[in-house]
């Protein structure tokens, strides 16, 4: 059943059931008072519970952060966050923003009315999908409905064959009748998705022209422009998603930019998109579906940045929040990009996206016993209402947070003392739900909860590393999010990862990622030819045409020519296969031997086999058009003595490999200078996270205030 379409509201960007009770809370750290002439960069990441703000002083490299509750209208939360950071809008040189607005709109199906016009006989392509299921064996599990109900999918007589020959032109009488229906229904957003239009867009363009004649104010998206690729389900669904999100993202971006400029901001509002770049509010109106993975991309970008500052080109990102954990991989300084992703299974969005695996493992994930009597952890979550049992807001089922606070790894206060945790309630829930049914002591039950959570995350890391041909032993683990640093060392031990890195501000690291990106557009075009018979002159001409389109898009976003950069990629596959791999190529291709060599090498790594003697074909070409921004640079601090400052206290903590609790020193991270070394066992607390340093581990603060923990490998 499809939710009824209605007028857009930014209330849809936030699940109001998850609004926190502590509406008055504003969390600040390290106030930054800018003087006249100084400018700052501000990044904002809107989550379901909190809006995180990261502020970088361009002159000193100093960073400070702020948190405010996410509001019903997310724009209010953004402006509240900037205010909480003590930053004036006219001091902001650059503002970038990651948002779940588009993601939530697709999940809830709350967007303005829209229609799809397609080839007669293909009305149900986006509902039939590929015939696969998220859970193959659960035949009773309902699939999510398409973004447009059947009554909102209209058809017209037309046909183009596989080679691009127009067999039947658009029936003009039918087309004008459809225009009459659309006008009568007051629809202003239409997706035109014709079969084989990726190879010849003539009929789609004619249908668009007729609609514009009959309804001058209508907004039309053509599948041949949005995603000119084969496979109609993927192309149709991407175009439909882009159409329904365009007014949502466009209105949001325009209003946010307007309110900020009214307050004195003079620049563009930059919105983070799935590919790891940003687009202006104008660009978001045209390619809104790229915002559907806005939030998770920021964490992956920041993780790579932190790892490279610490001296690691290979890194695995562990972004553990309250409900979920996002995991990504960076090899040789490059994040992995995928074209195969979705917000909900069965409805692909084919814009390039940073490859991030999300699992239901967070601080609020529930521990429970399944029908077979096994201990499970997540994906169910306590959310922010009622939250973990220890929050004393009505929660009854134990969570990872409850286990951590009971074992002493978390203190009794969070968020700078504004949230008090009830350890007794956590213990009772652990005993009732896990301890008694499994015959475990309360401490062993709490340890078991965390071990299952760690096992779930370790399995996810294996999927993004070992499954792709990468050995975790060659990587650093970057642990962040509110809960990542609690589990980082335990996870590294399970996976034999040699080092764990914790950013200076783990809880707002995703917001930092928004400061590290360029304006990017990804253009694709089908180009099917055997490598041996490819016309290189024609191939280069196609690339130049795509680069010119990219140049026009960047110019539309006010990017100067000297700040434009273009990269070319060829998607290759073995003849007869349909899965392909994207291979970078030089600006002017003189031959394809090196590209073919790279293809065989990458195919062997990712799929564990290659066939150097088999014929290879090109199936698609891509251009990434980039408008370069000045990157954020963190302040570099001189290294001081290894001796850390005195701990602020102690408490008994139970660690994984110890048989009893150890009286453990507690450190305030704000007091740890560059060069300081903290010997485990220890717990390091800060405003937005807590770091567990088990016995035998040393936490060292580097010149960028990144904490590095070497993890000895077991024999």
What kind of feature is each model-predicted range?
Residues 6, 19, 24-114, 168, ...:
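N-terminal glycine/serine-rich phosphate-binding loop of ATP-dependent small-molecule kinases
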Residues 38, 46, 173-177, 181, ...:
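C-terminal, non-catalytic interaction/recognition modules in large multi-subunit enzymes and RNPs
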Residues 44-74, 144-163, 420, 523-530:
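Short glycine-rich, Thr/Ser-proximal phosphate-binding strand/loop in the N-terminal lobe
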Residues 55-64, 132-137, 147-166, 187, ...:
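Gly-rich Lys/Arg/Thr-decorated short loops/hinges at beta-loop-alpha junctions or inter-strand turns
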Residues 63-70, 115-121, 141-143, 281-282, ...:
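Glycine-rich phosphate-binding loop of actin/hexokinase-like ATP-binding domains
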Residues 75, 79, 84-85, 224-231, ...:
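ATP-dependent carbohydrate kinase catalytic cores
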Residues 113-165, 223-227, 513:
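Active-site phosphate-binding/coordination module
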Residues 193-239, 623-641, 702, 707-713:
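Terminal amphipathic helices with adjacent charged low-complexity linkers/tails
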């Amino acid at each position: 059943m499809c939710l009824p379409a209605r007028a857009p509201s930014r209330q849809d960007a936030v699940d109001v059931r998850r609004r926190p009770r502590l509406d008055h809370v504003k969390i600040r750290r390290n106030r930054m008072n800018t003087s006249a002439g100084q400018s700052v960069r501000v990044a904002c990441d809107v989550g379901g519970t909190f809006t995180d703000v990261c502020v970088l002083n361009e002159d000193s490299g100093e960073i400070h952060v702020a948190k405010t509750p996410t509001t019903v209208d997310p724009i209010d939360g953004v402006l509240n966050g900037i205010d909480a950071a003590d930053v004036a809008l006219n001091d902001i040189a650059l503002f970038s923003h990651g948002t779940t607005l588009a993601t939530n709109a697709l999940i809830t199906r709350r967007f303005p009315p829209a229609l799809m016009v397609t080839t007669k006989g293909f009305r149900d392509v986006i509902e039939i999908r590929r015939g696969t299921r998220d859970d193959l064996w659960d035949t009773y599990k309902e699939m999510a409905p398409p973004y447009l109900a059947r009554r909102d999918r209209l058809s017209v007589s037309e046909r183009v064959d596989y080679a691009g020959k127009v067999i039947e032109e658009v029936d003009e009488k039918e087309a004008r009748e459809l225009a009459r229906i659309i006008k009568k229904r007051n629809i202003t957003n239409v997706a035109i998705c014709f079969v084989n239009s990726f190879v010849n867009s003539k009929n789609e363009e004619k249908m668009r022209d007729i609609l514009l004649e009959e309804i001058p104010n209508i907004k039309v998206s053509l599948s041949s422009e949005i995603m000119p690729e084969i496979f109609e389900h993927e192309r149709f669904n991407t175009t439909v998603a882009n159409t329904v999100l365009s007014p949502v993202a466009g209105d949001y971006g325009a209003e946010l930019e307007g309110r900020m400029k009214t307050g004195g901001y003079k620049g563009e509002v930059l919105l983070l998109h799935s590919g790891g770049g940003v687009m202006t509010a104008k660009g978001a109106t045209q390619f809104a579906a790229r915002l559907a993975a806005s939030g998770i991309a920021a964490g992956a970008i920041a993780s790579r940045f932190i790892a490279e500052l610490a001296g690691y080109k290979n890194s695995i990102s562990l972004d553990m929040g309250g409900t979920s954990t996002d995991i990504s991989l960076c090899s040789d300084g490059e994040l992995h990009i995928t074209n195969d992703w979705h917000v909900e299974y069965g409805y692909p969005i084919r814009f390039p996206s940073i490859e991030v695996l999300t699992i239901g493992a967070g601080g609020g994930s529930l521990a429970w016993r399944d029908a077979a009597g096994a201990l499970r952890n997540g994906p169910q979550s306590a959310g922010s209402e009622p939250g973990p049992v220890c929050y004393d807001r009505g929660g009854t089922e134990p969570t990872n947070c409850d286990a951590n606070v009971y074992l002493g790894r978390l203190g009794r206060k969070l968020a700078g003392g504004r949230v008090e945790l009830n350890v007794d309630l956590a213990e009772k829930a652990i005993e009732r739900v896990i301890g008694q049914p499994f015959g475990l002591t309360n401490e062993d039950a709490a340890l078991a909860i965390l071990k299952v959570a760690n096992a779930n995350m370790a399995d996810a890391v294996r999927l993004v590393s070992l499954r792709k041909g990468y050995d975790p032993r060659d990587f650093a683990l970057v642990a962040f999010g509110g809960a990542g640093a609690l589990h980082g060392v335990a996870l590294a031990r399970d996976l034999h990862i040699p080092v764990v890195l914790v950013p200076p501000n783990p809880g707002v690291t995703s917001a930092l990622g928004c400061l590290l990106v360029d304006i990017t557009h990804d253009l694709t075009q089908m180009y099917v030819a055997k490598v041996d018979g490819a016309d290189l002159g024609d191939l280069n001409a196609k690339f130049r045409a795509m680069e010119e389109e990219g140049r026009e898009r960047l110019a539309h976003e006010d990017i100067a020519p000297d700040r434009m950069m273009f990269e070319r990629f060829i998607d290759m596959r073995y003849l007869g296969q349909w899965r392909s791999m994207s291979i970078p190529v030089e600006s002017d291709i003189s031959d394809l031997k090196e590209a073919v060599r790279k293809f065989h090498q990458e195919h062997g790594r990712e799929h564990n086999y290659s066939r150097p003697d088999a014929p290879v074909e090109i199936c698609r070409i891509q251009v990434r058009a980039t408008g370069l921004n000045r990157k954020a640079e963190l302040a570099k601090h001189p290294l001081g003595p290894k001796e850390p400052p005195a701990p602020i206290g102690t408490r008994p903590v139970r660690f994984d490999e110890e048989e009893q609790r150890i009286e453990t020193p507690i450190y305030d991270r704000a007091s740890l200078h560059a060069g300081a070394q903290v010997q485990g066992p220890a717990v390091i607390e800060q405003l937005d996270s807590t770091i567990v340093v088990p016995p035998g581990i040393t936490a060292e603060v580097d010149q960028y205030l990144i904490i590095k923990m070497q993890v000895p490998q077991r024999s």
